[in-house]
């Protein structure tokens, strides 16, 4: 099996096919245009600069294009970067497909669907259960295909559903630890909190923000969807407002995107488990790229910190049959 792009080390030469994940145009100090490419395969992505680009280059090297790249890996300000020596678009004779380069959730779609369905059927409040079932059914295809974000955490195929499954497991453990928590409300909040991203984002590949995503955002979108679902189902009552509050407050603070802070116990828990699972995903994926005894690249979303991979922990994981 060919080595993944994130497993190359500084100084190594690269001669591989990669998928363009995103492209950003810039102007260099000499006044000439350049492109910042984020290139990916199934293992992750890497940044590369394409200097002195022409208008033709800008029209050719676009997201979702497959390219053949020859270059070298180097470290730039604490992050791995691919220095391009030559680049071309892949052609039909190269026999490569976009799906060959897409990172996917480490859990089968049908298994995630089964897990989430179990949690829905564990709900005893009929209003909360019906709204949750209705909305999940309405957006089922996209929910199980979309990433949870464009960057930082769970930004891979089926990342949204995988994020929700992980959060439901955390929620279940906390409900068992704190029996006073409303299980139905917390489970529903977990399932619905990011469902608006199927409208906010453009799709599962090279996701970008839609018009609704830019002007509204996934939080207000889902608050509106809950209201429409309740009206369609003929449901009224306090549950609707509280469920909307769960979604509205899950980012925790106004400066993080929530118009209201959590003011219901389950909303507070939802905020913390969402934050925890997102951060663990960022850290784990960064640690996968380094060897025991090394530090990760700086993680911008985590105050630009690097994380160390202890040697003794890796030995223990291997003894248990896990991965290090």
UniProtKB/Swiss-Prot annotation:
Its EC number is 3.1.-.-. PROSITE patterns: HD. GO terms for molecular function: 3'-5'-RNA exonuclease activity; nucleic acid binding. Keywords: Exonuclease, Hydrolase, Nuclease. Gene3D superfamilies: Hypothetical protein af1432, Nucleic acid-binding proteins. It comes from the Bacteria. Pfam families: HD, tRNA_anti-codon. InterPro entries: 3'-5'_exoribonuclease_YhaM, HD/PDEase_dom, HD_domain, NA-bd_OB-fold, NA-bd_OB_tRNA, YhaM_exoribonuc/phosphodiest. SMART domains: HDc (SM00471). The keyword tRNA-binding does not apply. Residues 163-279 form the HD domain. Transmembrane segments: none annotated. GO terms for biological process: rRNA 3'-end processing. The keyword Cell inner membrane does not apply. Belongs to the YhaM family. Shows a 3'-5' exoribonuclease activity. This is 3'-5' exoribonuclease YhaM. It comes from Geobacillus sp. (strain WCH70). The lineage of its organism: Bacteria, Bacillati, Bacillota, Bacilli, Bacillales.
